[in-house]
Amino acid sequence: FARIEAYKAGEFDFVHENAAKNWARGYIGQKFSNGSLLKTELPNSNAQGMQAFYFNIRRPLFADVRVRQAIGLAMDYEWMNRQLFYNQYKRSYSYFTNTAMAATGLPSPDELRLLQPLKDRLNPSVFGEVPMPPNTNPPNSLRDNLRQARALLAQAGWTYRDGALRDAAGRPFEFEVLLASRTWERILAPFSRNLEKLGIRAKVRVTDTSLYKKRVDDYDYDMIVHWYLSSQSPGNELTFRFMSNAADELGADNFIGLKDPAVDALINRILAVETRDELITASRALDRVLRHGHYAIAHWHNNVHRISYRKGLGKPQQLPDYYHSEDWVVAAWWWDDNPRATASQSKGARAP
């Protein structure tokens, strides 16, 4: 809280807050009560990409899509958001979260024109509803999700006996989550407990930064935390992340180990588009195929900019569509000689 206390003491005039705990518990006190410091949330329309737990499907353990889907069903995001994040996040759902590139519902006719020529390489489910992350909001529940997970694991050849989930050879289901920071341990703890209910042991390994980078560059891990950033116009970065030729290139960004000719074809289509509409269609088709592969367990994102500022700062009534709050404040805010008027004018300042 040192930065927050310095802000309250007047050492600077504006704060963008990333930490949910700080936002919920730190921005309180007399100066907030009397209005000399203001606290607000502004809509965040920036592309979010997808932060997630990513499977390394180079590992035979994760080769079966049913296994990956089952493990994803064990993460109770809604519980995490309530108990750990002060209900301040939204679940991410797409590799292009918060953009027009995110697939929704059934494939559109334009998407089908791209997917049909690839049908022999695609799971038939790709032509159905695009999967959304599982949730535990009523009428759904963790119990139901774990029941579904057990069924998927059984279909994939895993059975529970002698205190663990085991394959046909009797080997227990164990994997390691490689981390570079202990920050993630408290988040992994409830997830690991849920996996234990399935008979799966998830071990957490925290290493120093240099060893972490070496292991990730060498693809020496079962699962990692990563954030694939995205933009409103995806392009060349997709080749390093998801194309087959990047899967065996040490130090590349294909952390999943994905080698899928259908994915390669869709990325090549994205790189060849000539119009915005074609880009949206091809990106949605790619997103659809990736999400049906259950290669990641999606995390969460912040759909607002959490900001606090000193009374007397003026700001434009109209928000930009896409912005980082710190840059916007430096570029467009000002000291106002009539802060009362500015405050009254900006109450409804969210972009239409």
Residue spans of the language-model regions?
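Extracellular/periplasmic solute-recognition and catalytic clefts
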Residues: 1-59, 66, 70, 75-95, ...
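A local structural motif
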Residues: 161, 171-176, 193-207, 265, ...
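Short, well-ordered beta-strand elements
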Residues: 40, 51, 171-181, 202-205, ...
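Cysteine-centered nucleophilic/redox motifs
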Residues: 71, 138-139, 143, 183-200, ...
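Detector for C-terminal structural segments
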Residues: 73-132, 147-150, 182-193, 214-352
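Immediate post-signal peptide segment of exported/extracytoplasmic ligand-binding proteins
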Residues: 65, 146-176
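Short, conserved helix/loop micro-motifs enriched in His/Cys and acidic residues
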Residues: 123-131, 166-179
